Design a protein with these regions (language model features):
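Mixed-charge (Asp/Glu-Lys/Arg
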Residues: 1-183
Length: 183
């Protein structure tokens, strides 16, 4: 008797998970995304539910969520074909919440990640050709407080200043409005 009720509970739980996924996909397909408080605290959810689909909707190619031990400062890698007919490669580091410019902040970590992202190659699936990024993006689900962006820019080599982009919640929501709309 208990095994039958356990199986029923497991089946209901699986069904609930499937429905949750379907509802999420329907919301996205209908052109909207509800910003969740969870995005401010859970980097993985922010990456999977916001950044990955947004990058794809923006038309980037080979969008890969690479978060983990061998990410080399990049939670995402992706590319685009430029007007000159060459591929431009990007690296994106995501953070949940705000980034501040205060003492003992996440800035030194971000600077190290940017340095790794530019210096270390990455490899596409089934390719032995190393790829190097030309643009590094810091995307956060909160906002950059005080002088955070200025500190990052001032601490990286001057040659990469024009290759750094900063996306906060406000700009991400603007991009969602532009690229996530129902066609």
């Amino acid at each position: 008797m208990h095994s039958a009720s356990g199986a029923a509970v497991a089946a209901l739980a699986k069904g609930a998970e499937i429905l949750k996924t379907i509802i999420g996909e329907a919301e996205i397909a209908l052109g909207g995304i509800r910003w969740k408080a969870e995005y401010e605290t859970d980097e993985k959810v922010f990456c999977e539910e916001v950044l990955a689909p947004l990058l794809r909707r923006m038309g980037f190619l080979a969008v890969r969520y690479t978060h983990g031990v061998r990410e080399n400062g990049r939670d995402f890698t992706f590319s685009e074909l430029t007007s000159f007919g060459v591929m431009r490669h990007y690296g994106l580091q995501a953070k949940a919440g705000d980034v501040s410019g205060g003492v003992n902040s996440a800035i030194d970590e971000l600077i190290g990640q940017a340095d790794d992202a530019f210096k270390m190659p990455y490899y596409e699936i089934a390719s032995t050709e190393p790829r190097y990024i030309s643009t590094f993006i810091v995307a956060i689900s909160g906002r950059f407080t005080s002088n955070a962006k200025d500190k990052i820019v001032q601490k990286v080599p001057r040659g990469v200043w024009g290759s750094l982009l900063f996306l906060d919640r406000e700009l991400i929501l603007e991009l969602i409005g532009r690229y996530w709309a129902v066609s």
